[in-house]
């Protein structure tokens, strides 16, 4: 079983006099920086000068600096910009201003694990990764609780890397729920696998296939949309809150029997074998090489071209109409 730390076990003392530079002020940067500040840490925010994020961070009461200035001043540099800009940002602004004894901190392990960034040997390399969106990280903190985080130390140069890691987890509010020990390798491989095989790739592809099956059999697209896509959230919410068996106990008896007996016909041993192939390509670096190469060559078009194809699919055309019925004021 994984090791878990709780709030009462952790002290902020080891980092209370250290300055934390939060690099980036998107959804996670906003939430984590404000939680740290409210927990009493010395926080600066490192951003591109003059942008909308700069104004937002300043209006939230933060001292805002350029990325280079923030890294030079801080003891802990907490990197919360998108994965694919981290390497260049590190080369241009962060790396030249990171000196012995500082800590490089992340909320995702990819840049370090795949060596997009190669940290010097005389700094700590740590991770605090909340398992929820930034809005939830902030919301649960303000409610007096927190969003769990997974935590790891890749490099302990100072001997105090774990104190820094756990202190950040406490300041973010995550220790109130629990800090779960992991490794950089485990975080990125399981995170990418979940995104590809289940959460994003697998579930979206399954929904499209189910929709096509019904429409090709002569059913109305609008009805198919409701049955295979719209109602999915109800089931996922139950699974998240009550577990898989808890979901089975809360659906109709017909849904329970049909799902338990027919589900394995859809997701069978061959599906699991293909999932294994997806995992292997993550583990051996095949996917990383493909992704980085595609992004360097095509930028956002590396994935936009697939999304453009889906935009013309019937499930999206019908979906836009159905969503307008339920949320007339929403924009997509």
From Swiss-Prot:
<comment type="pathway">
    <text>Amino-acid biosynthesis; L-isoleucine biosynthesis; L-isoleucine from 2-oxobutanoate: step 2/4.</text>
</comment>
<feature type="domain" description="KARI C-terminal knotted">
    <location>
        <begin position="183"/>
        <end position="329"/>
    </location>
</feature>
<dbReference type="Pfam" id="PF07991">
    <property type="entry name" value="KARI_N"/>
</dbReference>
<comment type="similarity">
    <text>Belongs to the ketol-acid reductoisomerase family.</text>
</comment>
<feature type="domain" description="KARI N-terminal Rossmann">
    <location>
        <begin position="1"/>
        <end position="182"/>
    </location>
</feature>
<dbReference type="InterPro" id="IPR014359">
    <property type="entry name" value="KARI_prok"/>
</dbReference>
<dbReference type="Pfam" id="PF01450">
    <property type="entry name" value="KARI_C"/>
</dbReference>
<feature type="binding site">
    <location>
        <position position="134"/>
    </location>
    <ligand>
        <name>NADP(+)</name>
    </ligand>
</feature>
<keyword id="KW-0100">Branched-chain amino acid biosynthesis</keyword>
<dbReference type="GO" id="GO:0009099">
    <property type="term" value="P:L-valine biosynthetic process"/>
</dbReference>
<feature type="binding site">
    <location>
        <begin position="83"/>
        <end position="86"/>
    </location>
    <ligand>
        <name>NADP(+)</name>
    </ligand>
</feature>
<feature type="binding site">
    <location>
        <position position="48"/>
    </location>
    <ligand>
        <name>NADP(+)</name>
    </ligand>
</feature>
<keyword id="KW-0560">Oxidoreductase</keyword>
<feature type="binding site">
    <location>
        <position position="191"/>
    </location>
    <ligand>
        <name>Mg(2+) 2</name>
    </ligand>
</feature>
<feature type="active site">
    <location>
        <position position="108"/>
    </location>
</feature>
<feature type="binding site">
    <location>
        <position position="231"/>
    </location>
    <ligand>
        <name>Mg(2+) 2</name>
    </ligand>
</feature>
<feature type="binding site">
    <location>
        <position position="191"/>
    </location>
    <ligand>
        <name>Mg(2+) 1</name>
    </ligand>
</feature>
<dbReference type="InterPro" id="IPR036291">
    <property type="entry name" value="NAD(P)-bd_dom_sf"/>
</dbReference>
<keyword id="KW-0028">Amino-acid biosynthesis</keyword>
<dbReference type="InterPro" id="IPR008927">
    <property type="entry name" value="6-PGluconate_DH-like_C_sf"/>
</dbReference>
<feature type="binding site">
    <location>
        <begin position="25"/>
        <end position="28"/>
    </location>
    <ligand>
        <name>NADP(+)</name>
    </ligand>
</feature>
<comment type="function">
    <text>Involved in the biosynthesis of branched-chain amino acids (BCAA). Catalyzes an alkyl-migration followed by a ketol-acid reduction of (S)-2-acetolactate (S2AL) to yield (R)-2,3-dihydroxy-isovalerate. In the isomerase reaction, S2AL is rearranged via a Mg-dependent methyl migration to produce 3-hydroxy-3-methyl-2-ketobutyrate (HMKB). In the reductase reaction, this 2-ketoacid undergoes a metal-dependent reduction by NADPH to yield (R)-2,3-dihydroxy-isovalerate.</text>
</comment>
<comment type="pathway">
    <text>Amino-acid biosynthesis; L-valine biosynthesis; L-valine from pyruvate: step 2/4.</text>
</comment>
<feature type="binding site">
    <location>
        <position position="227"/>
    </location>
    <ligand>
        <name>Mg(2+) 2</name>
    </ligand>
</feature>
<dbReference type="GO" id="GO:0000287">
    <property type="term" value="F:magnesium ion binding"/>
</dbReference>
<feature type="binding site">
    <location>
        <position position="53"/>
    </location>
    <ligand>
        <name>NADP(+)</name>
    </ligand>
</feature>
<keyword id="KW-0521">NADP</keyword>
<dbReference type="InterPro" id="IPR013116">
    <property type="entry name" value="KARI_N"/>
</dbReference>
<dbReference type="GO" id="GO:0009097">
    <property type="term" value="P:isoleucine biosynthetic process"/>
</dbReference>
<feature type="binding site">
    <location>
        <position position="252"/>
    </location>
    <ligand>
        <name>substrate</name>
    </ligand>
</feature>
<dbReference type="InterPro" id="IPR000506">
    <property type="entry name" value="KARI_C"/>
</dbReference>
<dbReference type="InterPro" id="IPR013023">
    <property type="entry name" value="KARI"/>
</dbReference>
<keyword id="KW-0479">Metal-binding</keyword>
<dbReference type="GO" id="GO:0004455">
    <property type="term" value="F:ketol-acid reductoisomerase activity"/>
</dbReference>
<dbReference type="GO" id="GO:0050661">
    <property type="term" value="F:NADP binding"/>
</dbReference>
<feature type="binding site">
    <location>
        <position position="195"/>
    </location>
    <ligand>
        <name>Mg(2+) 1</name>
    </ligand>
</feature>
<keyword id="KW-0460">Magnesium</keyword>
<protein>
    <recommendedName>
        <fullName>Ketol-acid reductoisomerase (NADP(+))</fullName>
        <ecNumber>1.1.1.86</ecNumber>
    </recommendedName>
</protein>
């Amino acid at each position: 079983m994984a090791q878990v730390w709780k709030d009462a076990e952790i002290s902020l003392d080891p980092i209370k006099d250290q300055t934390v530079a939060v690099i980036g002020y998107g959804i996670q940067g906003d939430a984590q920086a404000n939680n740290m500040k409210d927990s009493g840490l010395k926080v600066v925010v490192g951003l591109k000068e003059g942008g909308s994020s700069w104004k937002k961070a300043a209006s939230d009461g933060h001292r805002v600096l350029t990325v280079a200035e923030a890294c030079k001043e801080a003891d802990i540099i907490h990197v919360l910009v998108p994965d694919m800009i981290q390497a260049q940002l590190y080369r241009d602004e962060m790396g030249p201003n990171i000196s012995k004894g500082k800590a490089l901190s992340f909320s995702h392990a990819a840049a370090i694990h795949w060596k997009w960034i190669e940290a010097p040997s005389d700094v700590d390399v740590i991770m605090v990764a909340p398992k929820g969106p930034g809005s939830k990280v902030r919301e649960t903190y303000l409610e007096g609780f927190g969003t769990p985080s997974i935590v790891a130390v890749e490099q302990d140069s100072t001997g105090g890397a774990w104190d820094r890691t756990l202190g950040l987890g406490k300041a973010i509010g995550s220790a109130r729920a629990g800090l779960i020990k992991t490794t950089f390798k485990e975080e990125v491989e399981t995170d990418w696998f979940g995104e590809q095989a289940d959460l994003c790739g697998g579930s979206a592809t399954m929904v499209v296939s189910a929709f096509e099956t019904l429409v090709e059999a002569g059913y109305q697209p609008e009805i198919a949309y409701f049955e295979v896509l719209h109602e999915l959230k109800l089931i996922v919410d139950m699974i998240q809150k009550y577990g898989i068996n808890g979901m089975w106990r809360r659906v109709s008896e017909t849904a329970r029997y049909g799902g338990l007996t027919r589900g394995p016909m859809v997701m069978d041993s061959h599906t699991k074998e293909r999932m294994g192939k997806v995992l292997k390509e993550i583990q051996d670096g095949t996917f990383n090489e493909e992704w980085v190469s595609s992004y360097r060559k095509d930028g956002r078009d590396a994935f936009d071209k697939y999304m453009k194809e889906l935009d013309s699919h019937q499930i999206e055309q019908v979906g836009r109409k159905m969503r307008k019925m339920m949320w007339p004021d929403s924009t997509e």
